[in-house]
Regions:
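Rossmann-fold NAD(P)-binding glycine/threonine-rich loop
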Residues: 90-112
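N-terminal Rossmann-fold NAD(P) dinucleotide-binding loop
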Residues: 11-12
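Short acidic low-complexity segments
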Residues: 48-59
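Aromatic pocket-lining residues of Rossmann-like dinucleotide-binding sites
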Residues: 18
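C-terminal active-site/capping subdomain that shapes the small-molecule cofactor and substrate pocket
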Residues: 227-326
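Active-site-lining helix/loop region of Rossmann-like oxidoreductase modules
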Residues: 5, 133-263
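Beta-loop-alpha module in the N-terminal Rossmann-like domain of NAD(P)-dependent dehydrogenases
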Residues: 63-79, 93-96
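NAD(P)-binding Rossmann-fold cofactor-contacting core
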Residues: 25-42
Length: 326
């Protein structure tokens, strides 16, 4: 049995992904019962095993996907304490750090906690692990993200441009003002090129955990001049129900046959769709015991079946595009 905590944009995409691929029961909970019931009713036409439920019923699930706004730590602590595995889609640095601290709780209760199972972080970890197979060794990873999922994701993007970015540079964590460090990043079509800036993103923290050999890790997010100017003010324009076409760019640098090599791969898809498919595939793997080890993990870690998970994500319609040189 798989539970979904939150029936917004990401939660709906998780439910859609699971209703097609999974043959297990799916429980949907949202603070707005009407939203959860509407989602379950819509998907019940293709999967009769999905239904809306109350919060306490989720304790019966084997794994719960936290698809609502951050913070996820209090909710994750609640479920882990009941022995329920958790898949978190949070992309907030402080929240991810707090989730990592729940590793002992997960181990004590023989539960699995997956942190950052979204687009970035999440899909980015899969792509780094996949690209690393073409190198003798890797030492740099640079992530860029364009677009947002639902309204909560848009608000997080707004906050990410007003805080402090974090990056791993030659053996130490460096903090820089978010919104600085402009870099033109090319994403797969139809997204194209966007100016990207440092942001308060958890990718460097989680990527470094999955790949301890890295010397440099950075993460940037696309932003317009207006985004940067108003980043330190409350959002003046209400966010849209769902963002448009998004993009993810993963650049890996390392050595192969004694030469310096750079490889780049990208994804062009709605951010909420990628997050929903990734977290749904991870939850399904936990539900069928493909992932069974207790403790806290991030996607891309060598102890996880990353290749199988990435194959499942791509089979669900999320395609990766390699950048080729003329």
């Amino acid at each position: 049995m798989i539970g979904i905590f939150g029936a917004g944009v990401v939660g709906a995409r998780v439910a859609e992904s699971l209703s097609i691929e999974s043959q297990t029961s799916i429980l949907v909970y949202d603070s707005s019962q009407i939203v959860a019931q509407r989602l379950a009713r819509r998907l019940s036409e293709t999967n009769s095993l999905i239904k809306a439920t109350n919060r306490s019923e989720l304790h019966r699930a084997k794994v719960v996907v936290l698809a609502g706004p951050s913070p996820h730590t209090p909710v994750a602590k609640e479920f882990l304490g009941k022995g329920v595995s958790v898949v978190s889609t949070s992309d907030d640095i402080a929240d991810c750090l707090n989730l990592l601290s729940l590793s002992d709780l997960a181990t004590e209760n023989k539960a699995t906690l997956i942190i950052g199972a979204a687009s970035s972080p999440g899909m980015s970890g899969f792509l780094v692990r996949n690209l690393s197979k073409g190198f003798d060794s890797i030492d740099e990873v640079h992530i860029a993200l364009h677009g947002t999922g639902g309204p909560a994701c848009a608000r997080q993007h707004h906050r990410a441009l007003s805080g402090q970015s974090i990056g791993w540079h030659d053996g130490e964590w460096l903090r820089r003002p978010a919104g600085s460090g402009r870099e033109l990043c090319w994403f797969p079509e139809p997204v194209g090129a966007y100016d990207c800036y440092r942001g308060e993103l958890p990718d460097p923290l989680l990527i470094k955990r999955a790949f301890p050999e890295l010397v440099r890790v950075t993460a940037r997010v696309s932003a317009t001049r207006r985004d940067r100017v108003f980043a330190r003010l409350p959002m003046l324009i209400p966010p849209r129900a769902e963002g448009g076409m998004g993009g993810l760019r993963v650049e890996v640098r390392g050595t192969k046959n004694g030469e310096r090599v750079v490889d780049v791969v990208g994804v062009a898809e709605r951010v909420g769709q990628v997050a929903g498919v990734v977290s749904g595939c991870v939850a399904r793997s936990i539900s069928v015991s493909e992932i069974s080890q207790p403790g806290a993990f991030v996607l891309g870690e060598s102890s996880l079946p990353n290749e199988a998970l990435l194959s499942r994500v791509m089979a669900s319609g999320v395609q990766a595009h390699s950048f080729v040189r003329a």
